[in-house]
């Protein structure tokens, strides 16, 4: 009898110990199952990590953009100060400044903004083709170009320009520049302009009038592309006849007027600072294939 009681107590004790040992194991197994099913706690932890990660990236991008824009502003200031110190007719200094500003605009604002500011399409295209870093940064922008019908037409125009640009030497003087520009436009089927010389001469005449502000030039339907072309040839001619100080003063006035023109042009067309629609040849109205 006593042996039976002893065996019964031994059996109950062993069963209780098994329960005590297996309980943590069962809890561990349940936790593993819940985590595999995607419990709320696991998703909350993952979501908070993702939020911290993306928030840091957004803040870093904003800080980088502010830094780049401050660099661009500093570059303009340094360029103006450098031009004031020029004591000889150095048009190369102007071109050097223009190229530096162009590179910064391409990097910070993109190709569309550079075109809207009056930089020649071939300059933009060449920069995209030969500068690997900018090409990588603007990869998304270029993809947008190819998908957008309006900008796709612009890319087609650049290809046509590139074809005849290879066979024509750059202009060496104002008269050669006018002929060069006119011949180029005539070779474009979509822009068969017959009076490019007249338009360019009228533009230079308007820019020569110091009383006309940038806003007044916008009211005369002057586009950034034609403005930039005329200003380029004006600068070359002025550099031949003006002293260093006179040329610096002339250039600073032109820079201020061009800045006013760009702001007024943007306001007139209701263009945002970025991703603006382009009207490079806004001065031309085509009627029956003839530009007027």
Curated annotation (Swiss-Prot):
Q: GO cellular component annotations, sorted alphabetically? A: extracellular region; host cell cytoplasm; host cell nucleus
Where does motif RxLR-dEER map?
Answer: 49-64
Which family, according to UniProt? Answer: Belongs to the RxLR effector family.
The subcellular location is: Secreted; Host cytoplasm; Host nucleus
Q: What does this protein do?
A: Secreted effector that suppresses pattern-triggered immunity (PTI) in plant host.
Please give the record's induction comment. Answer: Expression is up-regulated in spores.
Q: Which gene encodes it?
A: RXLR-C19
Endpoints of the signal sequence:
1-20
Designated name of the protein: Secreted RxLR effector protein RXLR-C19
Q: Where are the transmembrane segments?
A: none
Top-level taxon of the source organism: Eukaryota
Domain comment text? The RxLR-dEER motif acts to carry the protein into the host cell cytoplasm through binding to cell surface phosphatidylinositol-3-phosphate.
Q: Keywords assigned by UniProt?
A: Host cytoplasm, Host nucleus, Secreted, Signal, Virulence
């Amino acid at each position: 009898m006593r042996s039976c009681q002893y065996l019964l107590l031994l059996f109950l004790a062993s069963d209780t110990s098994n329960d005590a040992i297996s309980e943590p194991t069962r809890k561990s197994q349940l936790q593993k199952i819940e985590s595999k099913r995607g419990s709320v706690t696991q998703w909350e932890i993952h979501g908070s990590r993702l939020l911290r990660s993306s928030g840091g990236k957004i803040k870093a991008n904003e800080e980088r953009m502010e830094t780049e824009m401050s660099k661009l502003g500093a570059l303009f200031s340094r360029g103006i100060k450098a031009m004031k110190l020029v004591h000889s007719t150095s048009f190369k200094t102007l071109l050097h400044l223009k190229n530096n500003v162009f590179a910064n605009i391409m990097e910070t604002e993109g190709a569309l903004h550079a075109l809207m500011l009056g930089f020649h399409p071939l300059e933009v295209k060449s920069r995209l083709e030969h500068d690997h870093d900018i090409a990588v940064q603007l990869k998304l922008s270029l993809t947008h170009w190819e998908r957008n019908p309006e900008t796709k037409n612009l890319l087609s125009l650049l290809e046509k320009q590139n074809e005849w640009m290879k066979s024509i030497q750059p202009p060496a003087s104002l008269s050669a520049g006018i002929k060069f520009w006119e011949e180029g436009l005539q070779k474009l089927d979509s822009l068969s302009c017959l009076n490019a010389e007249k338009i360019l001469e009228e533009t230079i005449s308007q820019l020569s009038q110091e009383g006309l502000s940038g806003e007044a030039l916008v009211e005369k339907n002057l586009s950034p592309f034609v403005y930039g072309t005329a200003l380029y040839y004006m600068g070359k001619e002025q550099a031949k006849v003006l002293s260093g100080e006179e040329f610096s003063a002339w250039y600073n006035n032109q820079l201020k007027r061009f800045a006013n023109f760009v702001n007024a042009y943007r306001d007139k067309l209701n263009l945002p600072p970025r991703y603006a629609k382009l009207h490079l040849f806004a001065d031309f109205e085509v009627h029956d294939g003839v530009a007027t």
